[in-house]
């Protein structure tokens, strides 16, 4: 029934704002990529900024809030010794106003199945962990097949909120 009172009334004004972001990424490899093995060394270095113009956040009401600029950087490296296994250390950092996040971790990756005579699919198993500064420890596992992956991650609270959460993520 379109005449039922629902209590949700909004001015149907169109609101838009301009937001400027920019970033760049550099990828390197010690050798040409190959479907059957990990590169001996490779990595990615990235950095980006969001909300460069530090505009106003538009809401359904007339209230507006300043948006702080966000800086993000990440470093990902892959080191494969026997080329059937690799260690991938990584770091992620983000800064917005006075809030920050710094997370560092690593994953061990193993080839389970390489391409065979008639296909170029590969299966990779990964297990790893990370630590987010003053906040949480993380564990994760992942299985990749061809261009698909499925994984599970869990966080254990290490911050001052540990008492309330009993350490669970």
Positions of PLM-derived features:
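Outer-membrane pore/translocation modules
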Residues: 1-78
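Outer membrane beta-barrel transmembrane domains
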Residues: 61-80, 85-169
């Amino acid at each position: 029934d379109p005449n039922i009172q629902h209590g949700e009334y909004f001015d149907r004004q169109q609101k838009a704002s301009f937001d400027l972001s920019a970033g760049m990424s550099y990828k390197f490899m010690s050798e040409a990529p190959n479907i059957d093995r990990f590169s001996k060394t490779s990595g990615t270095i990235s950095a980006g900024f969001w909300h460069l113009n530090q505009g106003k956040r538009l809401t359904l009401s007339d209230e507006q809030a300043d948006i702080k600029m966000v800086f993000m950087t990440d470093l990902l490296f892959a080191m494969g010794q026997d080329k059937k296994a690799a260690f991938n250390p990584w770091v992620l950092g983000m800064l917005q106003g006075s809030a920050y996040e710094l997370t560092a971790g690593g994953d061990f990756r193993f080839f389970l199945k390489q391409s065979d005579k008639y296909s170029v699919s590969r299966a990779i198993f990964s297990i790893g962990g990370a630590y987010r500064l003053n906040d949480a420890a993380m564990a994760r596992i992942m299985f990749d097949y061809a261009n698909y992956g499925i994984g599970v991650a869990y966080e254990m609270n290490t911050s001052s909120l540990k008492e309330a959460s009993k350490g669970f993520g």
